[in-house]
């Protein structure tokens, strides 16, 4: 169960050939959990938006990350896909599209580290129900002409990893720790801070 207080993101790669969408939560330590997947082809934008909204439910999303090409105007409507998603109730955020830097960032998220209990882990964890991400990510190969990039064929293998790349390119933030200290509406009610370097540090922590 993902706590309600964690920051939640939706990241997607959209096309008629495939919609790959992932809901990701980031905890207080900065670990990310990919906890839900939508992987379906032949969805027009209104159908895709309807499914995304239904699966999100009452969850509050920090951002919905999507590739920059969704902001290109479509010849049939004169509107961009991002604008059409907005009309359906989904405001997209343009993710960075530097492929190489995105893969570098994803490798950092996947490298072995220690979790909050000191056990071997990675900063990015994938729930078992995200079957297509688990299936396609390990099959992604290096591009023969640019080993720093991932191959774009077979194309079916690229949708889920690309969606994940947009997430890490968006520089997701960890969940803010709850501030249990009392807040004061007026400065005159705030306790006087001690002088010196310690006092400066404490004042910085209050805001």
Task: Locate predicted features.
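Residue-level detector of short, conserved catalytic/binding motifs and their immediate flanks
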Residues: 19, 62, 161
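Short beta-strand scaffold segments in enzyme catalytic cores
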Residues: 19-25, 165
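Generic recognition of flexible, low-complexity loop/linker segments
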Residues: 7-11, 21, 51-55
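Stable alpha-helical structural segments in soluble proteins, enriched in small hydrophobic residues
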Residues: 159-167
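ATPase catalytic-site recognition across NTP-hydrolyzing enzymes
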Residues: 1-12, 17
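Conserved structured core elements
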Residues: 15, 157-158
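Mg2+-dependent endonuclease catalytic cores in nucleic-acid-processing enzymes, primarily RNase H-like
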Residues: 28-153, 172-189, 196-207
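Anionic group-transfer/hydrolysis microenvironments
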Residues: 13-15, 69, 164
């Amino acid at each position: 169960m993902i706590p309600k207080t964690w920051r939640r993101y939706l990241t997607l790669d959209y096309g008629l050939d495939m919609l790959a969408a992932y809901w990701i939560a980031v905890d207080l330590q900065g670990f990310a959990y990919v906890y839900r997947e939508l992987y379906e082809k032949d969805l027009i934008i209104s159908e895709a938006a309807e499914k995304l909204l239904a699966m999100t439910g009452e969850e509050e999303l920090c951002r919905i990350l999507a590739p920059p090409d969704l902001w290109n105007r479509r010849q049939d409507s004169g509107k961009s896909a991002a604008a059409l998603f907005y009309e359906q109730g989904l405001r997209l955020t343009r993710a960075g599209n530097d492929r190489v830097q995105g893969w570098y960032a994803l490798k950092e998220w996947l490298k072995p580290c220690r979790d909050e209990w000191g056990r071997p882990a990675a900063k990015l964890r994938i729930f078992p129900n995200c079957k297509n991400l688990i299936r396609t990510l390990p099959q992604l190969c290096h591009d023969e002409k640019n080993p720093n990039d991932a191959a774009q064929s077979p194309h079916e293998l690229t949708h889920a990893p690309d969606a994940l790349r947009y997430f890490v390119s968006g520089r997701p933030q960890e969940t803010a720790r709850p501030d249990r200290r009392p807040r004061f509406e007026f400065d005159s009610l705030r306790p006087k801070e001690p002088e010196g370097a310690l006092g400066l540090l404490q004042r910085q922590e209050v805001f």
